[in-house]
């Protein structure tokens, strides 16, 4: 069996459990999925966004989260995204044979978003998005950038996300999550030309 076949045949899946004084979360991610999502965080809009992310990235995602929502949504939303980042990192393993970098433009009605990712192991995150409302559903719009940061830093990858224009905050955030799913899908694909090697001149990610 060739090296690249080994990479393709390995199930790229991870389950993360996080229990703190604020949250209790179990998250399972399959990179090479079919877009199936079963997300229950107690935050309806976050459930919607993660379901769209999985669908557009063709990831399989299951999330069960209980948190101190009687205070606010911050701890639960943040910890879910911490778990998602860690699951991405663990599921990718050594990241051998992956495309590594990719980007995606996604429109949602009047809004347009761009997300670019580099799975090179160097965590960084830049989010440029202006929102006109304080909340969309149960999620504060001031949390959106922090959620992407939580995924990127715990996933050990570089993420740049920009809402290029738009009026409706729901549409802007939805375009961001869809673009993130599609960019990550493209970056995690196996490139047979790499022959199962690490996509870096350093030889390690």
UniProtKB/Swiss-Prot annotation:
Name listed for the protein in its UniProt record: Imidazoleglycerol-phosphate dehydratase
Biological classification of the source: Bacteria, Bacillati, Chloroflexota, Chloroflexia, Chloroflexales
Family label: Belongs to the imidazoleglycerol-phosphate dehydratase family.
Organism: Chloroflexus aurantiacus (strain ATCC 29366 / DSM 635 / J-10-fl)
GO cellular component: cytoplasm
Pathway(s) of this molecule: Amino-acid biosynthesis; L-histidine biosynthesis; L-histidine from 5-phospho-alpha-D-ribose 1-diphosphate: step 6/9
GO biological process: L-histidine biosynthetic process
Keyword Cytoplasm: yes
HAMAP family in UniProt: HisB (MF_00076)
